[in-house]
From Swiss-Prot:
HAMAP family: Arg_succ_synth_type1
InterPro entries: Arginosuc_syn_C, Arginosuc_syn_N, Arginosuc_synth, Arginosuc_synth_CS, Arginosuc_synth_type_1_subfam, AS_cat/multimer_dom_body, Rossmann-like_a/b/a_fold
Pathway in which the depicted protein is active: Amino-acid biosynthesis; L-arginine biosynthesis; L-arginine from L-ornithine and carbamoyl phosphate: step 2/3
Residues that coordinate or bind L-citrulline: Y90, S95, N126, R130, S181, S190, E266, Y278
EC number(s) stated in the UniProt entry for this protein: 6.3.4.5
Pfam family, one: Arginosuc_syn_C
Similarity comment text for this entry: Belongs to the argininosuccinate synthase family. Type 1 subfamily.
Protein name as catalogued: Argininosuccinate synthase
Chemical reaction(s) catalysed: L-citrulline + L-aspartate + ATP = 2-(N(omega)-L-arginino)succinate + AMP + diphosphate + H(+)
Alphabetized GO MF terms: argininosuccinate synthase activity; ATP binding
Keyword ATP-binding part of the UniProt annotation: yes
Gene Ontology CC entries for this record: cytoplasm
A GO biological-process term: urea cycle
Species whose genome carries this gene: Rhizorhabdus wittichii (strain DSM 6014 / CCUG 31198 / JCM 15750 / NBRC 105917 / EY 4224 / RW1)
Amino acid sequence: MSDVKRVVLAFSGGLDTSVILKWLQQTYQCEVVTFTADLGQGEELEPARAKAKLMGVPDEHIFIDDLREEFVKDYVFPMMRGNALYEGLYLLGTSIARPLIAKRQIEIARAVGADAVSHGATGKGNDQVRFELGYYGLAPDIRVIAPWREWDLTSRTALIDFAEKHQIPVPKDKRGESPFSTDANLLHTSSEGKVLEDPWEEVPDYVYSRTVNPEDAPDQPEIITIDFERGDGVALNGEGMSPATLLTALNELGRKHGIGRLDLVENRFVGMKSRGMYETPGGAIYHLAHRGIEQITLDRGAAHLKDELAPRYAELIYNGFWFSPEREMLQAAIDHSQEKVTGTVRLKLYKGGVHVIGRKSPYTLYSEKVVTFEDDAGAYDQRDAAGFIKLNALRLRLLGRRDGR
């Protein structure tokens, strides 16, 4: 193992990656460079720097990069253009962060002359695949160290024992126990493990960290507007905002109204089912708003094709194929569809619910003249429907005659 001289570790400062840092130093006897991505997780960052220093990493080998704008602009918004929902529900908050972390990790590895990269994903989960597909897609010959697939620490309890033995501070949640397995960024917060591993048990209220209980949300609804240009949000209530600023503002609105909670049993790429609790307050609002503006700006054929492609697109992201040619091909088609997806959506937020209550666009395909139940002044000749129906019924009539119906 001595052939590894320097490794770049994706480091959150949590239990797993703190143990991994010490384990790499001991097992590989190499220099460890830590990289912490600021994706909007907030207070997690400075403790990560302090912990890395405490464990012997010099300042010049501690990287904490603010990637919030890049994350939303180049990853979240493109994904949202595709209306991606994994298994019809999950807004992919963890999945979409991994390719950016992997990309920056490889950039740092090249800059510091590292021999390898390392991550804290377990051998049971999706993240090991997502990270490593990103690494290999960007640096085909990079060496990857995945401690969970190498060491004999087979449980969280074993990790805690290792941490205590080596005087590594172990984070505690507000109930005085070791924390859930969590992931946080500007798009979402996820929690897994402990009581959540029983799919029959209701998620305890203390697990939710990002949204108020919908029952305790304001008793009055709040009306907002989101402006879109070419498929991307650009303004909230008429105020222009950068991508990260917009999502941050929507997160606060969603938090206040208890929006974006999801209790999901999902199918992992590696084959097993897992249960996760997700909070995506701003993303839930944004997703519905984007669907709302598409309703009046996309042609039926384009809209239906997008709906057919969306599950495949979401699956590619979930499984870690962000840098694959097929994801890029789908992205090109999706982005082309967004050329006229410009306008304003009005939404109502109330006790965990978000509802589109208005939409307008200079490129609208909605014609009140044509669709009205009142006199349309010749905008639509209803007699034309007879021929349309006869042509579409032809094959059904032929089948019926043949089969004696």
